[in-house]
Amino acid sequence: MMHRNQTVVTEFFFTGLTSSFHLQIVLFLTFLCVYLATLLGNLGMIILIHLDTRLHIPMYFFLSHLSFVDACSSSVISPKMLSDMFVDKKVISFLGCAIQLCLFSQFVVTECFLLASMAYDRYVAICKPLLYTLIMSQRVCVQLVIGPYSIGFVSTMVHIISAFVLPYCGPNLINHFFCDLLPVLSLACANTQMKKRLLFIVAGILGVFSGIIILVSYVYIAITILKISSADGRRKAFSTCSSHLTAVSILYGTLFFIYVRPSSSFSLDINKVVSLFYTTVIPMLNPFIYSLRNKEVKDALIRTFEKQFCYSFQDKIL
């Protein structure tokens, strides 16, 4: 039980990225450009998929939701991080911290399972091409999108309830630039070993489960590709998966580094650097990975620009 003379924490302060003013300017300009590129790339991808009817297939339906999740997850972190760059007191309310943690956790878990849904879609497309339209019906696609959002919501509630039912009565300086779960738990006025163990177990189960779906899908995909007689056929089949594999490798590598490591190797400072990568850089990279390495997206982009140019040219003539 808490003593009456203990102070209940109503707000938290961030240590931020650096205390050097000159470095803050460089970081501010860098991550402002990264955030703008993230919004432009992901929202542009959503609009492109919506406008081009040739992209109205399951693969790009999932990609549009991935772009939405990336834009949202970046917007949960980046605006606050950028606004805190040049203020002495980087403060956030207790409720604001809970909301930021809730939203970011939701989008991260959702992205992991969206990538699993996309892996299953690639498996059906390559391994069962004749049954693709039958298996990947509109109903199934909607279910494969609702599922990740639902899993993200449930897992987020587990983490939020675990973290914010604890008493916070002493230190309120978070060694981070946003409200991440482990740094927040380290400030609780209670033994958090069980909570951290729960985080490790839940993160491990979610990561392993979604990872197994992706791994099994690609094992079957690899077996099918190896059975293709022509080298050109194998290359085309692999090219449809290369963008997805790149996105999966980058995201899962950073998440496992932070959340599924033994506690003996845990370091808040190292996590801060890695978190900076997966909260700001990865959401920016995904649309470029899928567009630069995907002929259909590049062709759709060219068609959209040509169509808009023709419309504007006709308006000028008329």
Swiss-Prot record:
One of its GO terms (biological process) is sensory perception of smell. The keyword Ligase does not apply. Pfam families: 7tm_4. GO terms for molecular function: G protein-coupled receptor activity; olfactory receptor activity. One of its GO terms (cellular component) is membrane. Residues 1-28, 78-93, 166-198, 261-271 are extracellular. Residues 50-56, 115-144, 220-239, 293-318 are cytoplasmic. It is found in: Cell membrane. The chain crosses the membrane at residues 29-49, 57-77, 94-114, 145-165, 199-219, 240-260, 272-292. It comes from the Eukaryota. Keywords: Cell membrane, Disulfide bond, G-protein coupled receptor, Glycoprotein, Membrane, Olfaction, Receptor, Sensory transduction, Transducer, Transmembrane, Transmembrane helix. Glycans are attached at N5. Disulfide bonds join C97-C189. The keyword Lyase does not apply. It is a multi-pass membrane protein. Potential odorant receptor. Belongs to the G-protein coupled receptor 1 family. This is Olfactory receptor 5G26. It comes from Mus musculus (Mouse).
